[in-house]
């Protein structure tokens, strides 16, 4: 994760897996059933093959090197990036940030093919969605992907999280 550090990410993972509020876990405000569930789920997670790298400003080159090693040595079967726009393209100079994000996107596509594993890259949306009206207006579109038109071209699949209740639209 490029957005959260290891501790934050692990805390969120534990909260999600245990289905217990992160606030309750951090404050130790759990009832007996929740303590038992936390204990049981932590034992399961302890041996899970999950590797987190929170290197800030990770470049595509650094990611490729680390991913190759993890696939070779640990048998990693999925690579997740949180999130694409926090990466950089190996210190290369670009005319715009859009060109750089496009290069990053193409590099991730190449990495997925090279390693023969899926690469799931999260992306930020532009603010355009916030300015549109109504239920359909708030639904994210491919053109809302921030800083690149290449993401939609490079991706095998693009999924959006859309919560109408967030906008009080039912």
Predicted regions and their residues:
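Conserved nucleotide-binding/hydrolysis micro-motifs of P-loop NTPases
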Residues: 4-7, 16, 56-59, 84-87, ...
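Cytosolic-facing regulatory segments adjacent to core modules
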Residues: 1-75, 89
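Short, basic, glycine/proline-bearing loop/turn elements
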Residues: 48-53, 94, 127-136
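Phosphate-binding/switch region of NTP-binding enzymes
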Residues: 99-170
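Short glycine/proline- and charge-enriched loop/turn segments
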Residues: 16-22, 94, 132-142
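Conserved ATPase-coupling elements of RecA-like P-loop NTPase cores
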Residues: 88-95
């Amino acid at each position: 994760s490029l957005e959260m550090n290891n501790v934050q990410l692990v805390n969120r993972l534990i909260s999600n897996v245990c289905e217990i509020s992160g606030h309750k876990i951090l404050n130790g405000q759990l009832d007996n059933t929740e303590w038992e569930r936390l204990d049981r789920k932590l034992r399961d997670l302890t041996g899970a093959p999950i590797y987190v790298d929170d290197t800030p400003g990770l470049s595509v080159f650094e990611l490729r090197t680390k991913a190759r090693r993890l696939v070779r040595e640990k048998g990693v079967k999925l690579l997740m990036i949180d999130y694409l726009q926090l990466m950089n393209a190996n210190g290369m100079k670009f005319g715009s940030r859009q060109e750089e994000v496009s290069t990053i996107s193409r590099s991730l596509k190449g990495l997925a093919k090279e390693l023969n594993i899926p690469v799931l890259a999260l992306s930020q949306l532009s603010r355009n969605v916030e300015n549109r009206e109504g239920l359909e207006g708030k639904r994210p579109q491919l053109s809302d992907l921030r800083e690149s038109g290449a993401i939609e071209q490079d991706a095998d699949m693009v999924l959006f999280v859309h919560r109408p209740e967030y906008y009080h639209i039912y």
